[in-house]
C-alpha cells in the first residue's frame, strides 16, 4: 500500500524533527523483560531511516515484535514508559486515558519514541463512541444519523474537519468508520454506530467518512471485518456468532469489496465466529478469516495488502474468557494480523517474552513478522529528520 506524501509529511511533523541513524545495527531494549512499563528507563534508540522493505534488517527481533503492538495508556507517564522501555509501535487513547496527555506531553513522547514513528490511535467514531469529545467540539452525530440527514459530501467534509482537529492533537490512526451493516436498534452493540442496513448506503457513507479522515492526514480503519451487524451479541460480553459466510458475502462483506481498494486504509478484524469460515475460533484469531481479507477470494474482493489490526484482546470477553493477553496476541499474529491491540500496558513485557519464545520455537515465522513490519513501516511513513 503506497503511503501518500501528505500523510507522511504530517506524520513527520507530529513527531517533530529528531536525529536519525542510518546505521545497520539492530536496535533492542536494554530493560529486562520483568521491568514494569510504569517505571521509565532511558533507552537511547537510533531511528531507522531505510525504505519500508529495508526496515526489518535494521531491527532486533524484539523491536520487530514491539512494532506490531498498539496498547492503551492511562496517562502521559504510562505512555512515556512503554514507549521508552519497550519501543511499542503505537499507543491507544482510550476511554480511561487522561486527556491532559495532549497538553504537550504527547509531542515529547512522539519525538523521543522508538526506531519508527509512534502510531497514536483512538476510537473516535462520533455519536456515542467519542473519546475526544471534550477536545474536538462534542460528540458529533452518530453514523446512522449522518446517513439519514447528510449528503455523502457533507459526511466527507465533517470527517475531514474532525480529522484535522485530531491531527492537531497528534492522532495518526482512527479506528473508524464502522462498516457493519445493520438495522438493529440504536442502543445495541452496533446499532446507530452503523450507517444503515443497505450495503450500498454503508459503502457510500463509510467511504466518504474514511476519505475525510485521509484528507486530514489520519489513517481510517474499517471495522469490524467480516461483519458484526448481524452478530448474535456483544463480543465485549462473550462469544458472538454471525450468519454463515455464504450469507455475509451478499450483505455484510459488500462494503469491503470497494473500501479496501481506497488506500491508505486499515482493517480491524472482529471477535466473530463465522460458520463456514472460522469454526470455533473468532475471526481475529483465524487464519481463514485473515486470508479471506488478504486474498479477497471467496467474497469477490481484490487482494488487500494494507495493515490488519485485531480488535481489543484484553477487555472483551469473547477473547479474555478463553485466553490471556500473551496467548491472544500470539494467536492473532499467527492468524496473519499485523498489529495486536489491547487496552493496558502492564502485559507488554510478558507479551514480548512470549512472542520471542514463539519465534525461537518456530511457532511464529520470522518471515511473517518481517512482512508485518514492512506493512507497519509503510503505514507510518518516513521517520522525521531522515531527509525524505
From Swiss-Prot:
The keyword DNA repair does not apply. Residues 1-19 form the signal peptide. It is found in: Cell inner membrane. A lipid is attached at residue 20 (N-palmitoyl cysteine). GO terms for molecular function: beta-N-acetylhexosaminidase activity. Pathway: Cell wall biogenesis; peptidoglycan recycling. Keywords: Cell inner membrane, Cell membrane, Glycosidase, Hydrolase, Lipoprotein, Membrane, Palmitate, Signal. The record marks 234 as: Important for catalytic activity. SUPFAM superfamilies: (Trans)glycosidases. It catalyses: Hydrolysis of terminal non-reducing N-acetyl-D-hexosamine residues in N-acetyl-beta-D-hexosaminides. GO terms for cellular component: plasma membrane. It comes from the Bacteria. GO terms for biological process: carbohydrate metabolic process; peptidoglycan turnover. It is a lipid-anchor. It is an enzyme of class 3 (hydrolase). Its EC number is 3.2.1.52. Disruption phenotype: Deletion mutant is devoid of beta-N-acetylglucosaminidase activity and shows increased antibiotic and lysozyme resistance. Mutant is unable to grow on soluble peptidoglycan as a sole carbon source. Substrate binds at residues 123, 131, 193, 223-224. A lipid is attached at residue 20 (S-diacylglycerol cysteine). Its main location: membrane. PROSITE patterns: PROKAR_LIPOPROTEIN. The active site is at residues 236, 311. Belongs to the glycosyl hydrolase 3 family. This is Beta-hexosaminidase LpqI. It comes from Mycobacterium bovis (strain BCG / Pasteur 1173P2). The lineage of its organism: Bacteria, Bacillati, Actinomycetota, Actinomycetes, Mycobacteriales.
Amino acid at each position: 500500500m503506497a503511503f501518500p506524501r501528505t500523510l507522511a509529511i504530517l506524520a513527520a511533523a507530529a513527531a517533530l524533527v529528531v536525529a536519525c541513524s542510518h546505521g545497520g545495527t539492530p536496535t533492542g531494549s536494554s530493560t529486562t523483560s520483568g521491568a514494569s512499563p510504569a517505571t521509565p528507563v532511558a533507552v537511547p534508540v537510533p531511528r531507522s531511516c531505510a525504505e519500508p522493505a529495508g526496515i526489518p534488517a535494521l531491527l532486533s527481533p524484539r523491536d520487530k515484535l514491539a512494532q506490531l503492538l498498539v496498547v492503551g495508556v492511562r496517562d502521559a507517564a504510562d505512555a512515556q514508559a512503554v514507549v521508552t522501555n519497550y519501543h511499542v509501535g503505537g499507543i491507544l487513547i482510550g476511554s480511561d486515558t487522561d486527556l491532559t496527555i495532549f497538553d504537550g506531553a504527547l509531542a515529547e513522547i512522539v519525538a523521543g519514541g522508538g526506531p519508527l514513528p509512534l502510531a497514536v490511535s483512538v476510537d473516535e467514531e462520533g455519536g456515542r463512541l467519542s473519546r475526544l469529545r471534550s477536545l474536538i467540539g462534542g460528540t458529533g452525530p452518530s453514523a446512522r444519523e449522518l446517513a439519514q440527514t447528510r449528503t455523502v459530501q457533507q459526511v466527507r467534509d465533517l470527517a475531514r474537519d474532525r480529522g484535522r482537529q485530531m491531527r492537531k492533537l497528534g492522532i495518526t490512526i482512527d479506528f473508524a468508520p464502522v462498516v457493519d451493516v445493520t438495522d438493529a436498534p440504536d442502543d445495541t452493540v452496533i446499532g446507530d454506530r452503523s450507517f444503515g442496513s443497505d450495503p450500498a448506503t454503508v459503502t457510500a457513507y463509510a467511504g466518504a467518512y474514511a476519505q475525510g479522515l485521509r484528507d486530514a492526514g489520519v489513517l481510517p480503519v474499517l471495522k469490524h471485518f467480516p461483519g458484526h451487524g448481524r452478530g448474535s451479541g456483544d463480543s465485549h460480553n462473550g462469544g458472538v456468532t454471525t450468519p454463515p459466510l455464504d450469507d455475509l458475502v451478499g450483505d455484510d462483506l459488500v462494503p469491503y469489496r470497494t473500501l479496501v481498494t481506497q488506500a491508505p486504509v486499515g482493517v480491524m478484524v472482529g471477535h466473530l465466529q463465522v460458520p463456514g469460515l472460522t469454526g470455533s475460533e473468532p475471526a481475529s484469531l483465524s487464519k481463514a478469516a485473515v486470508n479471506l481479507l488478504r486474498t479477497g477470494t471467496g467474497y469477490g474482493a481484490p487482494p488487500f495488502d494494507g495493515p490488519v489490526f485485531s480488535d481489543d484482546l484484553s477487555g472483551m470477553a469473547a477473547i479474555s474468557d478463553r485466553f490471556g493477553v500473551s496467548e491472544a496476541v500470539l494467536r492473532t499474529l499467527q492468524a496473519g494480523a499485523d498489529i495486536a491491540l489491547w487496552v493496558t500496558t502492564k502485559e507488554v513485557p510478558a507479551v514480548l517474552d512470549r512472542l520471542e519464545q514463539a519465534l525461537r520455537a518456530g511457532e511464529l515465522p520470522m518471515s511473517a513478522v518481517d512482512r508485518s513490519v514492512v506493512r507497519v513501516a509503510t503505514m507510518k511513513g518516513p521517520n522525521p529528520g531522515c531527509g525524505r
